[in-house]
Amino acid sequence: MDSKDESSHVWPTSAEHEQNAAQVHFVPDTGTVAQIVYTDDQVRPPQQVVYTADGASYTSVDGPEHTLVYIHPVEAAQTLFTDPGQVAYVQQDATAQQTPLGGLEAKEEEDEDEDEDTEEDEEEDGEDADLDDWEPDPPRPFDPHDLWCEECNNAHSSVCPKHGPLHPIPNRPVLTRARASLPLVLYIDRFLGGVFSKRRIPKRTQLGPVEGPLVRGSELKDCYIHLKVSLDKGDRKDRDLHEDLWFELSDETLCNWMMFVRPAQNHLEQNLVAYQYGHHVYYTTIKNVEPKQELKVWYAASYAEFVNQKIHDISEEERKVLREQEKNWPCYECNRRFISSEQLQQHLNSHDEKLDVFSRTRGRGRGRGKRRFGPGRRPGRPPKFIRLEITSENGEKSDDGTQDLLHFPTKEQFDEAEPATLNGLDQPEQTTIPIPQLPQETQSSLEHEPETHTLHLQPQHEESVVPTQSTLTADDMRRAKRIRNAALQHLFIRKSFRPFKCLQCGKAFREKDKLDQHLRFHGREGNCPLTCDLCNKGFISSASLESHMKLHSDQKTYSCIFCPESFDRLDLLKDHVAIHINDGYFTCPTCKKRFPDFIQVKKHVRSFHSEKIYQCTECDKAFCRPDKLRLHMLRHSDRKDFLCSTCGKQFKRKDKLREHMQRMHNPEREAKKADRISRSKTFKPRITSTDYDSFTFKCRLCMMGFRRRGMLVNHLSKRHPDMKIEEVPELTLPIIKPNRDYFCQYCDKVYKSASKRKAHILKNHPGAELPPSIRKLRPAGPGEPDPMLSTHTQLTGTIATPPVCCPHCSKQYSSKTKMVQHIRKKHPEFAQLSSTIHTPLTTAVISATPAVLTTDSATGETVVTTDLLTQAMTELSQTLTTDYRTPQGDYQRIQYIPVSQSASGLQQPQHIQLQVVQVAPATSPHQSQQSTVDVGQLHDPQPYPQHAIQVQHIQVSGQPLSPSAQQAQQGLSPSHIQGSSSTQGQALQQQQQQQQNSSVQHTYLPSAWNSFRGYSSEIQMMTLPPGQFVITDSGVATPVTTGQVKAVTSGHYVLSESQSDLEEKQTSALSGGVQVQPPAHSDSLDPQTTSQQQTTQYIITTTTNGNGSSEVHITKP
């Protein structure tokens, strides 16, 4: 029998085995064949795979150069030749025996002389073929080592000598539990071991739990990582244990795939953290795992202490590597990398500021009907490239010196440009910027050495202006080269730019490495992997050969999508499809859709009605074109490489960014929006209808009613943007929101919001159908069930919340969070100030005590923030709960301005300092009384609480203080509050004269101001407004100007809640020695004191929170 034939019977041969086989050894005499197959040529230690006659395979990682496996024909024992002089017989009971090797020399001689082997095999074949005189053996008794032959009806010690060997069909290999439980996104390397990722796994992804038998610590075997499980007292008692157990992760049949995850040696290669949660141990990713990256685990901080291990500390080198890995946004000008695109954009702006040659100033010049920057570029848009032409000494242009400079325009430069710039109206046809001769050491660093360099800028328009001159240094030239490289790389990425072309076949490539790899096939002198049988032309891939074979076939390649006709040329097909035009349109043969162009219907058929053979590996979607599949795969990716330079929004696809720019940042849309805001619209009031009064929310200007509060707010913001919220009483009512319970239809969980229920279903019930949204429900038709039943919600009540108004428009929301989101979206310029926004207060602050301030700072009084409006709203809001009232943290700015009638005599003081040392709630002494205020007189019906502000002292700087003031400044306490004397009143008059043009200070009282501020208040300096209001006795408010001040003839400086309260305060003021009297008693007073009273007034003005001064008409009650 031929040895080759015997080998084919014994071995499962394949093309792969024949290519990889290194040697085939034939064991002499009665032995069978053993074959050595070496692995592929990868960069690994020398490995050998040995295939034996029984179909099994053995791998030797660090084995000898030659390994032979011999199957003994009689004893069925494996013989392993490990030493040239020894033979190891591996019996079936796994015992080994070393014996001297006697037949190895004969075997090697036969291997050296192949002809002799062939002759001996042919002789054996001749002997085996002579079976004419063969007689069956007598029946043999049962022996488990004999092979049964059904044809002979007898057993043989080996292969049947007459009928030959059997044709075995081996069992299908069954994976172990550990390998079968491996997730689809992971794979196990069969050579290196360890678990690797097929695709990107994001951070904070949980894997597990770990499965395997639990053993004691003394029974642990050698494995990758040791994991300990903390057991409860009940579990220990049930198992009769006194210690915690460990996972035994050495048996693939009992564990899951997590036994193959190898431990990390340092913090840099660690991407998983192990911890115990409940009765299970999980792995969680601590960083993004990239494709083909190995998963490596180490213990969490608390779990490491539990298993007596140390966590991996981050070294300084690892910290630098991690910092560089996080920077995924490179700058192609200075080779720096940044973490985010915003940082990269800010860095690029710094490059634009440094480059003075390409700086552009703002202007308004835009040409009409002029030449554009190539096809498809809008007028006024800057050129993408600036051509740098280096002129030699004799004036000739050098082609080698041409460089393309990439310009990065900012948004302002994009909008407007001045005439003398690149986008101006008047531009020369060629702007020349001469550059002086560079030093010799600088010239040697450049590619060219001309004496004069000229920078020629390609103009946009044809008019001429005075040339702009500047100088370029060696750094600018090197930077120009970097910009050119960045421009080339930009073209490689963004466009189908293939500059590297093969001169032999005309194929083009984007990278030079690809071209070099392609040229290797041309250098093989026609030895390409695939060859055409008709023209002997070689090809690299089967796709290239398949497309080439169409040239030799008679099959026509261009088929009509409307009929069975086909053509061998594209122009014939285009001429043919004209007969399928019906009324100027092409009709899709499948869906009857109509298209005006053949290209459109062709794309439609190819996109929607072709066979979808490209399957997505992440989901069940399939596509008919590979480019559509590539676009779809971006949905499963977290990268957003396309950034909107206007608003900062990021997109995964370039076409989505283009649609966003056309839809949101279209210049026509921006112009219409600006025009709509500036144009005032006139409305004709509608006729009063019978249904107008039935609406709760009404617009009294348009005579329109609205069912919901938000409809009225939107109407006011669009139709009446100048109208204030305070002018609409309905918008000051609390917002009523429904309170619902959201039930999970798959378990007994209940949530307070639909978003939390949705997150619960996605996490705990994957694949389950989500309940419909309440906002998208449609009213049920006749005979249909209520659609609210399908939402699995229940109304439990309502919640009333005070409205939160936007300080920049008329919008109002039920929570501050939504208002802040509105500001960030609609008012981005005020987004930084959104954290300091409070509900605006517009009520006047009217003192409840005589407004007498003395020069010694020991005197003080309490100013109560109460007036008619506050009193009325307090009485009206008594029925509301405390949830609807404004909290105590709401504040006002209070301004005290002493005004003098005489403008001569003393030096002008510089500032008046008002220091507030205490803020406390103030209760009205007549809360139990019935309201005496007409509701129709209210201008601001918002309820606010009353506060008492205790003024400790007023200090006037710019002139020497009186001795009493100096003494009070040294020791000041609220107990020094007392009435004023005549001396104090005189000093007060001197301090308060000449105050009309001086600066005053406002006291700013934010909410929770005592919690974070170590001093009493925050002082802000503000100038005196030109007109104010003075409290007078006649009930008419008079504006105070610089040249005219009305004297106060009455001593009533305070507006009280009622007349009885006013009389009580007047009595207490007179008994305290206050030198303020009505004019009827002026004869009994000191003339100097009376003069002081007539020349001193006090102005009390309120200012809302950042919205300007609110001058209130103040009169006596």
From Swiss-Prot:
Principal cellular location given in the protein's record: nucleus
Signal peptide: none
Residue numbers spanned by region C-terminal glutamine-rich region: 871-1097
Recorded GO MF terms: DNA binding; DNA-binding transcription factor activity; methyltransferase activity; zinc ion binding
GO cellular component, one term: chromatin
Cross-link (Glycyl lysine isopeptide (Lys-Gly) (interchain with G-Cter in SUMO2)): K354
Compositional bias of kind Basic and acidic residues: 446-464
Region (N-terminal PR domain): 201-305
Family, similarity comment: Belongs to the class V-like SAM-binding methyltransferase superfamily.
Function noted in UniProt: Transcriptional activator, essential for early embryonic development and survival of embryonic stem cells (ESCs). Supports cell growth and survival during early development by transcriptionally activating the expression of the translation initiation factor EIF3B, to sustain global translation. Activates the transcription of FLNC.
Name this protein carries in UniProt: PR domain zinc finger protein 10
Biological source species: Pongo abelii (Sumatran orangutan)
Gene name, Swiss-Prot/TrEMBL: PRDM10
